[in-house]
Amino acid sequence: MYKNYNDVTESPRNALIPMVVEQTAKGERSYDIYSRLLKERVIFLTGQVEDHMANLVVAQLLFLESENPDQDISIYINSPGGAVTAGMSIYDTMQFIKPDVSTVCMGQACSMGAFLLAGGAKGKRFCLPSARVMIHQPLGGFQGQASDIQIHAQEILKIKNTLNERLAFHTGQEMATIERDTDRDNFMSADQAVAYGLVDGILSQRG
């Protein structure tokens, strides 16, 4: 049985997930819609990027690789962003597994969502026509002794540099350009995201 519960902590939304009933040789079998789409190698990355959601996405990526290491996986992204460490666990797994991971932005891909969108397989990263993409530098907040604040500030700068290096690699932009363009919230339309190199094309319809 395929499982894909990205929002199990939100019971009202969970209660409204549609079910799909299929006829099999052994009778009827029902799936929630996300589990049924997982059978088609489709993963949904929606909402805030946090540890619980990231663990589920990573588990699905590893499972689909074990099922067929030679068939592409698609991740549909609609996310405002979230925790860098959670997002990096997804990103590193996308790069680690053998199947190409195609990314598709529907709605929005902001902050870490945009980073994961750009991290898809080259030539297989897409936006839907009305999607919005936003890149910026990592955010951080810490309270404590001055020496501890300094340590955390240095760590944020290291993370910022790592993210910028990876964005430069995936987009083909110069490092200086990435540093300038991520200094503040930088929103892009689907066309602008293509021109920037965050995605490879716009999907208006299948076929």
From Swiss-Prot:
Catalytic activity: Hydrolysis of proteins to small peptides in the presence of ATP and magnesium. alpha-casein is the usual test substrate. In the absence of ATP, only oligopeptides shorter than five residues are hydrolyzed (such as succinyl-Leu-Tyr-|-NHMec, and Leu-Tyr-Leu-|-Tyr-Trp, in which cleavage of the -Tyr-|-Leu- and -Tyr-|-Trp bonds also occurs)
SUPFAM superfamilies (alphabetical): ClpP/crotonase
Subcellular localization: Cytoplasm
Keywords of this entry: Cytoplasm, Hydrolase, Protease, Serine protease
GO BP, one annotated term: protein quality control for misfolded or incompletely synthesized proteins
Active site: 111 (nucleophile), 136
Alphabetized InterPro entries for the sequence: ClpP, ClpP/crotonase-like_dom_sf, ClpP/TepA, ClpP_His_AS, ClpP_Ser_AS
A Gene Ontology cellular-component term: endopeptidase Clp complex
Record Pfam families: CLP_protease (PF00574)
Highest taxon above the source species: Bacteria
Name of the top EC class for this enzyme: hydrolase
GO MF terms, alphabetically ordered: ATP-dependent peptidase activity; ATPase binding; serine-type endopeptidase activity
Protease as UniProt keyword: yes
Enzyme Commission number(s) of this protein: 3.4.21.92
CDD domains: S14_ClpP_2
Protein's job: Cleaves peptides in various proteins in a process that requires ATP hydrolysis. Has a chymotrypsin-like activity. Plays a major role in the degradation of misfolded proteins.
Entry's family note: Belongs to the peptidase S14 family.
NCBIfam families for this protein: clpP (TIGR00493), PRK00277.1 (NF001368), PRK12553.1 (NF009205)
Protein name: ATP-dependent Clp protease proteolytic subunit
Native organism: Aeromonas salmonicida (strain A449)
Lineage, highest ranks first: Bacteria, Pseudomonadati, Pseudomonadota, Gammaproteobacteria, Aeromonadales
